[in-house]
């Protein structure tokens, strides 16, 4: 599972040849490429749009709809971001589209209805949820079931030996509704690799940089 947020900055910083990195990932058994509308202000998706046609091995790809762009996770956000993401990626469809974060202030029916329409148009195969609490996952599933809309089948969330909240309630919810769990941040931002000699050391780049 290859996430394209922080890795993009590394590739640019060290002038690494992008397509060789992706080929190495696929050659060594990787299959799933993960990006998002907001990653590096769209640069990640544009980079993938350049690289994907050069890859010689099969892959699957996922992107995400984020409420922070329009200020709401609604139908407008879904249509705008899905279509722009596909244009950046130079694809007609992707394997999975995640709702990146929940938006408790906006009724979720609007974005779910739009995602169902986009799914019917063939823009993606699977609906995913990312960073949603268990109760909202259950709510989303039942709304989709009631309307006959595409249901979520995969969840993406933080999980590592230091961040284990998923074990309390989330895992049972995912098992109950049949969602796969893709964990991000498995090495706690590099903390578990021994990269930082002291807990007081501050990262100079990556997810946990003070910005």
Please give the residue ranges for each predicted region.
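N-terminal binding-site loop/beta-alpha segment at the start of enzyme catalytic domains
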Residues: 1-59, 92
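Short, acidic/polar
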Residues: 10-25, 73-90, 108-113, 137-142
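Acidic (Asp/Glu)-rich catalytic clusters
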Residues: 26-27, 49-60, 83-92, 116-120, ...
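A short, structured active-site edge motif that brings together acidic residues
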Residues: 58-70, 97, 156-158
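Short acidic, glycine-rich surface-loop motifs adjacent to enzyme active sites
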Residues: 94-95, 100-102
